[in-house]
Amino acid sequence: MNIKTALSRIVDHLDLSTDEMRDVMREIMTGQCTDAQIGAFMMAMRMKSESIDEIVGAVSVMRELADKVELKTLDRVVDVVGTGGDGANIFNVSTASSFVVAAAGCTVAKHGNRAVSGKSGSADLLEAAGIYLNLTPVQVARCIDNVGIGFMFAQTHHKAMKYAAGPRRDLGLRTLFNMLGPLTNPAGVKHQVVGVFTPALCRPLAEVLQRLGSKHVLVVHSKDGLDEFSLAAPTFVAELKDDQITEYWVEPEDLGMKSQSLHGLSVEGPEASLALIRDALGKRKTENGQKAAEMIVLNAGAALYAADLATSLKEGVALAHDALHTGLAREKLEELGAFTAVFKVENEG
């Protein structure tokens, strides 16, 4: 099916099949569509609302066209990732949590990009920390093998996304493409914590990942609007485990944490986010640093559970707490910077 035929279907509020969506996405991702067609398609899909079949089709094409990272095993390899777009502008929780997860002995294949709507995306933060981002897939795999954590810069691994970049920017609205990033990890991880910008996406995205072969995934949105677990409010979870999806709410107290305000955790940019994270992963000299540390532990604990290193969310949080207090997470951050610096010399001379 071509994009013109698809558009005539979508404007009549008719869903595309998975195969039809694959056809259209291949057209878009191989440069065969005009910007006007892509913009119209994104807008029509948003107005109709994307079906699970359509999201599965779109994700499968993006995965197919990605520059993949080949790992020795995907067993207990995890990604902590969010759609962004929650408008909260708090520090980079998922990225900071990834270093605690690595410190706990779990392998992390982190996928991320620059900021979508916030002040600091994962790529912006890591760049501020002196981590070199323009790595080849082989170099990312070496980071993961040697440091226990590696970062896959979305725009490097999903070059075909360039064809949709202009229409996305011009529309300035959330579209199908906002939810594709977290579902298209170039290493093909089967264990994830995926934060989303609305609770309405939790179950559908869990179903998409179930169809695509994921093993243990938590798709989450907190009641105070975050695309991650919150200290300040209950968090809604759609959990895929043992090929079953269960939905539930989690309070911080359920996981051995104290509910508290997120005041002081908003940042104006990557440098401020980095300073707060370094304090949280280090000596926690400030009140905000201590609070940030607890937010990090909460989300790292969820990742350790998703990776099956813990048998429950509460046990995962306890493991993350212990890992944070070893100081190893801060060391992992610096180690990744030093390790990627070698690749910068290799790639740029």
UniProtKB/Swiss-Prot annotation:
Note accompanying the cofactor annotation: Binds 2 magnesium ions per monomer.
GO BP terms in the entry: L-tryptophan biosynthetic process
Pathway as given in its UniProt record: Amino-acid biosynthesis; L-tryptophan biosynthesis; L-tryptophan from chorismate: step 2/5
A GO CC term assigned to this protein in UniProt: cytosol
Binding site residues for Mg(2+) 1: 94, 228
Pfam families reported for this sequence: Glycos_trans_3N, Glycos_transf_3
Cofactor: Mg(2+)
Binding site for anthranilate 1: 82, 113
Entry's EC annotation: 2.4.2.18
Protein function: Catalyzes the transfer of the phosphoribosyl group of 5-phosphorylribose-1-pyrophosphate (PRPP) to anthranilate to yield N-(5'-phosphoribosyl)-anthranilate (PRA).
Assembly and oligomerization: Homodimer.
Protein name: Anthranilate phosphoribosyltransferase
Source organism of the structure: Pseudomonas fluorescens (strain Pf0-1)
Lineage start: Bacteria, Pseudomonadati, Pseudomonadota, Gammaproteobacteria, Pseudomonadales
